[in-house]
C-alpha cells in the first residue's frame, strides 16, 4: 500500500522520501518514480527505531527543504486467539503498528512546525473501529491505538497548523493480505463480510490518503476516513 501512496503522491507533484526495512523493494519504487520524472529518495527505516526516524526526517529536510506530510503506513498482521497469543507476539505487532506511528509522529512534528504546518496521515484499519473474530487481539488493539493517538495529536497541534487524521481500510489487495487471500476458506469468509463483495485495491486507499494530505482537507483534523467496502456499516 505504501508503494501505491508514493506513486500517487509523486504523480501529483510531491517530492517523496520512502522508508522501509525492505531495501530492495523500496529502492525499486523510488527508482521507478525518478525514471518517470518524479523526485524520490529512499532511506532504510525500521519504524521501531528512533535513530532511523531521525535519519528519515533529516533526509527529507536536507534533500527537499522541508517536511510537510507524513504518512505512517508500516504494519504487520497476525491471526490468533487471546489465549494463544504470546507476549512476544503481542509486542511485535504493537511495536510496529502503534509504537512506530508514535515515533514517526514524534520525529516529524518539529520539522513540520519549522515548515509552518503539515499533515500527518496514519493508516489504521477498519478493525481499529470494530471487533472481529478473524484477526488477533494485538492487531485490533494496535489499530485502535493508532486511531486515538491520531486524535490526541490533532488536538495538541491544531493551533500550530499540524493536522492529523487516520485512514481505516478494510481488506485490501496487498502483500500483507496475500496469504489470507490465497486460502480459499479464509478469503471467502472475509469477502462475505464486505457488503461490496470484493477486496479493495491499494490505489483506492491511496486516493483517500492524498485527500487528507492535501490543502483540500485544510479543515479536516482528528477525523477517520473509512475505506472498507461497507464493513463497518453493518
Language model features: what each stretch is:
Residues 105, 142, 150:
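Active-site helix of classical SDR
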Residues 110, 155-156, 218:
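Alpha-helical segment proximal to the catalytic Tyr-Lys
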Residues 158, 163, 220-222:
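Short, small/polar-rich loop/turn modules that mediate ligand/substrate recognition or access, typified
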Residues 1-17:
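Canonical Rossmann dinucleotide-binding motif of NAD(H)/NADP(H)-dependent dehydrogenases/reductases
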Amino acid at each position: 500500500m505504501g508503494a501505491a501512496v508514493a506513486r500517487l503522491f509523486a504523480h501529483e507533484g510531491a517530492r517523496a522520501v520512502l522508508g522501509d526495512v525492505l531495501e530492495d523493494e523500496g529502492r525499486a519504487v523510488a527508482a521507478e518514480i525518478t525514471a518517470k520524472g518524479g523526485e524520490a529518495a529512499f532511506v532504510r527505516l525500521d519504524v521501531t527505531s528512533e535513530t532511523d526516524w531521525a535519519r528519515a526526517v533529516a533526509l527529507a529536510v536536507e534533500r527537499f527543504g522541508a517536511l510537510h506530510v507524513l504518512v505512517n503506513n508500516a504494519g504487520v498482521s497476525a491471526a490468533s486467539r487471546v489465549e494463544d497469543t504470546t507476549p512476544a507476539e503481542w509486542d511485535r505487532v504493537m511495536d510496529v503498528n502503534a509504537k512506530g506511528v508514535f515515533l514517526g509522529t514524534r520525529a516529524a512534528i518539529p520539522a513540520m512546525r519549522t515548515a509552518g504546518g503539515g499533515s500527518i496521515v496514519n493508516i489504521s484499519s477498519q478493525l481499529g473501529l470494530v471487533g472481529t473474530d478473524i484477526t488477533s487481539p494485538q492487531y485490533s488493539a494496535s489499530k485502535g491505538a493508532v486511531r486515538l493517538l491520531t486524535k490526541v495529536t490533532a488536538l495538541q497541534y491544531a493551533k500550530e497548523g499540524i493536522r492529523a487524521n487516520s485512514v481505516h481500510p478494510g481488506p485490501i489487495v496487498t502483500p500483507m493480505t496475500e496469504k489470507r487471500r490465497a486460502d480459499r476458506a479464509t478469503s471467502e469468509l472475509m469477502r462475505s463480510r464486505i457488503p461490496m463483495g470484493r477486496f479493495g485495491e491499494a490505489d483506492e486507499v491511496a486516493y483517500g490518503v492524498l485527500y487528507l494530505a492535501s490543502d483540500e482537507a485544510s479543515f479536516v483534523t482528528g477525523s477517520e476516513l473509512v475505506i472498507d467496502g461497507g464493513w463497518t456499516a453493518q
